[in-house]
């Protein structure tokens, strides 16, 4: 979004101060199994090959590139329906290839894992559309096949088109979605953490016994939204619970994140807008007995890097010539619930313009919060910003210029890392690996590549350190571990409680 061109600073190879005891910036590559992702229109660019995402080779080539650069993870966004707020129609979403069409991000993961050793994978999956048992089985399988290199980006779905696709007329109300998601997480913790003892799988050929059934607990979950009476069908994987990402900084989203997330994905045009939201999440986590620094915060960031500032500016100008302004407005309208086609070009946009309260409140807030950099949001300004980089900042410059900007965001917003978006693929991620990462390493703020003979680690160990494959002891999921497991009491509705507590003559 915001186009920043910070002045380059001298670098002498000494480690830079990132604040709050941080030593390294964590970087994920941010992609989506679709043609456009955050920069619609680049399919017209002859250098862009994003249409080849339908071929497995795209994904294996990308994974090997990211592995070569020592990137922490490939973070894959997903969506379950098209964007139909703009002009109250899906037509422009389809016409402009604004995250349409889109394939399932889960399918290529095992192929990418087979050609890498250290890269981890974070997949977006919703708590709104499938039973906890099915999701738990899929992620346990992926955790096995990747040797523990899997993460789950938890989302609560909000698009009307997605709910209609599964036979529901309207999305679940915003805060209700998070209450449902909280129960969903507790249900999958029970399956992942509480169903199998560590030594349940103990092959004993002499007695024709592969698994001890007495050490596989039946989960009997009776909640408001979900009911499970089952043993988990997959044996414990290297992490048991995948590394947990979550996106959203609304009041309900922040409360959910401070309880469940190990990493949070945020987005804004300004670090000053993010800083109080991040501080609030860390405060809420501390109130629950969690180490607030254990929650890692990643912001969207799209760098356009050249060997010099002038080269980067020339790249940016070329990329803008292919950008789809309408495609960007389609995404903006879908994310915020504001049909921007109804608003005059230079009229200020406010939250009151959103006609759909179920949309992503944190995104709506980001796009309607002003700063000194962007004192007012109008359709004209949105049109300039949204077509390249989508939600987050766009930094244009040499490796030194962009590295300065990354460091500034880390310090001013209290970030731990970034989800780095692309504009063209190939192109953007090659520049990340070949130009930007070496500069960050030169500054001492990005880890060196592991030794060839180093033992691979899990997704969670890459963040928390070797030996921490499972959930931390201060995470709520640890209360469901096999050895300490206690089944939650069945859900009882408020109406039932009121009737049971009413005097006999009232009953």
Where are these regions (language model features)?
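N-terminal glycine-rich cofactor-binding segment that shapes the pocket for flavin-like pterin cofactors
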Residues: 2-507
């Amino acid at each position: 979004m915001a186009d920043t061109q910070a002045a380059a600073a001298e670098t002498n190879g000494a480690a830079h101060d990132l604040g709050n005891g941080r030593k390294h910036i964590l970087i994920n590559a941010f992609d989506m199994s679709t043609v456009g992702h955050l920069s619609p229109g680049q399919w017209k660019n002859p250098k862009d090959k994003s249409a080849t995402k339908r071929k497995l080779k795209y994904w294996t080539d990308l994974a090997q590139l990211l592995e070569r650069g020592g990137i922490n993870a490939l973070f894959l966004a997903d969506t379950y329906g098209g964007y139909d707020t703009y002009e109250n129609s899906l037509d422009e979403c389809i016409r402009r290839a604004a995250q349409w069409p889109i394939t399932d991000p889960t399918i290529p993961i095992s192929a990418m894992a087979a050609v890498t050793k250290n890269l981890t994978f974070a997949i977006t999956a919703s708590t709104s559309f499938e039973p906890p048992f099915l999701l738990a089985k899929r992620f346990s399988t992926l955790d096995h096949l990747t040797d523990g290199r899997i993460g789950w980006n938890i989302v609560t779905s909000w698009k009307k088109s997605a709910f209609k696709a599964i036979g529901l007329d309207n999305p679940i109300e915003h805060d209700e979605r998070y209450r449902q998601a909280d129960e969903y997480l507790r249900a999958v913790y029970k399956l992942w953490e509480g169903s199998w003892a560590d030594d349940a799988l103990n092959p004993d050929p002499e007695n024709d016994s592969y698994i001890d059934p007495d050490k596989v607990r039946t989960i009997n979950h009776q909640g408001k939204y979900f009911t499970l009476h089952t043993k988990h069908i997959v044996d414990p994987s290297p992490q048991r619970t995948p590394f947990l990402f979550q996106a959203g900084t609304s009041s309900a989203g922040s409360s959910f994140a401070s309880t469940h997330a190990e990493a949070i994905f945020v987005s804004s045009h300004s670090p000053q807008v993010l800083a109080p939201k991040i501080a609030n999440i860390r405060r809420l986590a501390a109130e629950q007995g969690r180490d607030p620094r254990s929650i890692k915060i990643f912001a969207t960031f799209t760098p356009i890097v050249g060997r010099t500032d002038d080269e980067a500016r020339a790249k940016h100008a070329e990329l803008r010539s292919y950008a789809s302004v309408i495609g960007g407005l389609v995404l903006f309208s879908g994310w915020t619930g504001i049909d921007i086609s109804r608003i005059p070009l230079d009229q200020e946009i406010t939250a009151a313009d959103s006609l759909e309260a179920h949309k992503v409140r944190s995104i709506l807030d980001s796009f309607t919060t002003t700063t000194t950099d962007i004192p007012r949001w109008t359709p004209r300004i949105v049109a300039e910003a949204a077509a390249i980089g989508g939600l987050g900042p766009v930094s244009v410059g040499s490796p030194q210029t962009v590295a300065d900007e990354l460091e500034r965001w880390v310090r001013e917003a209290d970030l731990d890392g970034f989800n780095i978006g692309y504009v063209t693929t190939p192109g953007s991620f090659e520049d990340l690996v070949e130009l930007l990462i070496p500069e960050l390493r030169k500054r001492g703020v990005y880890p060196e590549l592991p030794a060839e003979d180093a033992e691979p680690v899990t997704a969670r160990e890459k963040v928390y350190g070797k030996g921490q494959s499972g959930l931390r002891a201060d995470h709520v999921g640890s209360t469901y571990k096999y050895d300490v497991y206690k089944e939650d009491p069945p859900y009882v509705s408020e109406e039932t409680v009121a009737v049971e507590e009413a005097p006999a003559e009232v009953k």
